């Protein structure tokens, strides 16, 4: 039954009017056609929406029933559980980062989670309202109600596309920020080391100008030993920073691959079930049409 109502949501999101389809194609990012695996799966999802639009408008009315609110509630709860699980994984990945960065990212994730819940709640309310109006008609024709619903859902599609693009931009900013932070750390160490070397050079020049040659040589040896010690510590610190950045990079890549695999595993079975449901439904409808068509009468 969940798959059946997923088909209902897909059909309504696809729109009931053919003239809204060019707008959808114009808004779809090109990266969904040749990007990461989860983006490719999302591209196949939108391709399937365009295919669903070619089906009969009567499919929507046949799928409506009194259980639509309950089924959508179950789907919403399952989706929010997945969002919370992914949020927990991100919090574990952010362990090596600064507290300020972790707090900012956690706040933005909570806001995105709230927007997602509000979007799904709006879809459920629109479908419930549409079902009630279809049953009572409220003085409107079915085409008028369908056009109103298509307008609301078209606005919702724009909002979802905007949120997806905003998420991609935020991920790019975080990636650039991490690289920039690592570069700043290395630059700061280099500047500090250069300052120590310059101070040592000035002190050596001052010592060599003293009349007592032995004292100058002693100070020079001590200074060189100090510089070598500082240089060794700086190199060790640089190596440690590089190792930490490499560990963070590997963890992020591993989590990203796992999430991409999860998205792929979620989308592809859903699409396969939807295709199977539609094939059975179309076959039943064709069989019903074939049996209900009266045989032509012969003229005497």
UniProtKB/Swiss-Prot annotation:
One of its GO terms (molecular function) is phosphatidylcholine-sterol O-acyltransferase activator activity. One of its GO terms (biological process) is melanosome organization. The modification Phosphoserine is found at residue 141. APOE exists as multiple glycosylated and sialylated glycoforms within cells and in plasma. The extent of glycosylation and sialylation are tissue and context specific. Coiled coil: none annotated. It is found in: Secreted; Secreted, Extracellular space; Secreted, Extracellular space, Extracellular matrix; Extracellular vesicle. Pfam families: Apolipoprotein (PF01442). Keywords: Chylomicron, Endosome, Extracellular matrix, Glycoprotein, HDL, Heparin-binding, Lipid transport, Lipid-binding, Oxidation, Phosphoprotein, Repeat, Secreted, Signal, Transport, VLDL. It comes from the Eukaryota. InterPro entries: ApoA_E, Apolipoprotein_A1/A4/E. Residues 1-18 form the signal peptide. Sequence repeats lie at residues 75-95, 96-117, 118-139, 140-161, 162-183, 184-205, 206-224, 225-243. Residues 152-162 are annotated as: LDL and other lipoprotein receptors binding. Residues 262-274 are annotated as: Specificity for association with VLDL. Heparin binds at residues 156-159, 220-227. One of its GO terms (cellular component) is low-density lipoprotein particle. Residues 74-246 are annotated as: 8 X 22 AA approximate tandem repeats. Its main location: secreted. SUPFAM superfamilies: Apolipoprotein A-I. Belongs to the apolipoprotein A1/A4/E family. Homotetramer. May interact with ABCA1; functionally associated with ABCA1 in the biogenesis of HDLs. May interact with APP/A4 amyloid-beta peptide; the interaction is extremely stable in vitro but its physiological significance is unclear. May interact with MAPT. May interact with MAP2. In the cerebrospinal fluid, interacts with secreted SORL1. Interacts with PMEL; this allows the loading of PMEL luminal fragment on ILVs to induce fibril nucleation. APOE is an apolipoprotein, a protein associating with lipid particles, that mainly functions in lipoprotein-mediated lipid transport between organs via the plasma and interstitial fluids. APOE is a core component of plasma lipoproteins and is involved in their production, conversion and clearance. Apolipoproteins are amphipathic molecules that interact both with lipids of the lipoprotein particle core and the aqueous environment of the plasma. This is Apolipoprotein E.
């Amino acid at each position: 039954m969940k798959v059946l109502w997923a088909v209902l949501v897909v059909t309504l999101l696809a729109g009931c009017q053919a003239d809204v389809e060019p707008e959808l194609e114009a808004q779809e990012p090109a990266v969904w056609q040749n990007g990461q695996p989860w983006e490719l799966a999302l591209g196949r999802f939108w391709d399937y929406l365009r295919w669903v639009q070619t089906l009969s408008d009567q499919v929507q009315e046949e799928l409506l029933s009194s259980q639509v609110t309950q089924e959508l509630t179950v789907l919403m709860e399952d989706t929010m559980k997945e969002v919370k699980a992914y949020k927990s994984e991100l919090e574990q990945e952010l362990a090596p980062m600064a507290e300020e960065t972790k707090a900012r990212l956690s706040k933005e994730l909570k806001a995105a989670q709230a927007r997602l819940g509000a979007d799904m709640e709006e879809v459920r309310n629109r479908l419930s309202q549409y079902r009630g109006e279809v049953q009572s008609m409220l003085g409107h024709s079915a085409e008028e109600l369908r056009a109103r619903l298509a307008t609301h859902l078209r606005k919702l599609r724009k909002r979802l596309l905007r949120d997806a693009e905003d998420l991609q931009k935020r991920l790019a900013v975080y990636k650039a920020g991490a690289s920039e932070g690592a570069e700043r750390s290395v630059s700061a160490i280099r500047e500090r080391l250069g300052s120590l070397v310059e101070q040592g050079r000035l002190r050596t020049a001052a010592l060599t100008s003293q009349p007592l040659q032995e004292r100058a040589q002693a100070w020079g040896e001590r200074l060189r030993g100090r510089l070598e010690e500082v240089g060794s510590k700086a190199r060790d610190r640089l190596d440690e920073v590089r190792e930490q950045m490499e560990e963070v990079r590997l963890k992020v890549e591993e989590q990203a691959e796992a999430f991409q695999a999860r998205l792929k595993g979620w989308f592809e079975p859903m699409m396969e079930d939807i295709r199977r449901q539609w094939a059975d439904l179309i076959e039943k409808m064709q069989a019903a049409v074939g049996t209900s068509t009266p045989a032509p009468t012969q003229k005497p």
